[in-house]
Amino acid sequence: MTSSSVAVSLAAGFGLTALFLVGSNITFNAGLYALFALFTGGLALVMVAIAVSISGAVPSSRLSLVANAFVYVYFTFIWNSLANGVSNLLNNQLGIGGSLRWHLTLFIKLLSPTQSYKTLVDSMVGSGENAERLARLGMFSRDADTEVICGDVLRGNFTTVTVQGFGNQTFERPVCEAGSQAVPFYFSDPAVFVYLLAWIGVAAAVSYYTFEKVDL
């Protein structure tokens, strides 16, 4: 299936769904739905482009199926561990810490098409001016330096709030609030969407190289 046929199928599917929602009693947010369709369509086109490039690079359909499954699993479940490993390498072996370390780590995380799609959707369904920032921060585990990521990387205001737990025990919970500055453009939703679509170019380059190699 080509990218154009996938685009047509997605457009038809989203269009019919939109018509159903408009005609039903369900509250329909057209802007939110359009963003969801855009992000989902972008991811679908990327995965199709990658699948096509892989099918042209391997000798059989069975290998193509296995390779595509591996790529999806790698992007979805392994890439984040790779980014965390690079982060630890930067800090422990190369002595690169602080803001630069977490800038690079977040950028690597965003290069995964499935991870970039997830954080775009998280930002979309979030509320308020801080949704974009919290979506990026949500890509990190609790072991990360939340204060540096919030303040220096995402330009937010880091603070803590006292929360009461079980047995009247209290603990401090870190909070990243909106700051006077917006999230850096290179970590904003438009930039993340560009990173997602860039994989179409990568897949096209692989397909072109494969074609040239076979043609020779």
Descriptions of predicted regions:
Residues I78-V192:
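Terminal transmembrane helical anchor/hairpin motif
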Residues V194-A204:
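Hydrophobic alpha-helical transmembrane segments
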Residues T2-P59, A67, N91-N92, G98:
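Secretory targeting signals
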Residues S61-N80:
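Pore- or pathway-lining transmembrane helices of multi-pass membrane proteins that form conduits
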Residues F36-T40, N68, Y72, V183-L196:
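Pore-lining and gate-forming transmembrane alpha-helices of multi-pass membrane transport proteins
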Residues A204-L216:
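Juxtamembrane interface at the cytosolic side of transmembrane helices
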Residues I50, W79, V202-S207:
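Hydrophobic/aromatic residues in alpha-helical transmembrane segments
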Residues G42-L43, L106, W199-I200:
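Alpha-helical transmembrane segments of multi-pass membrane transport proteins
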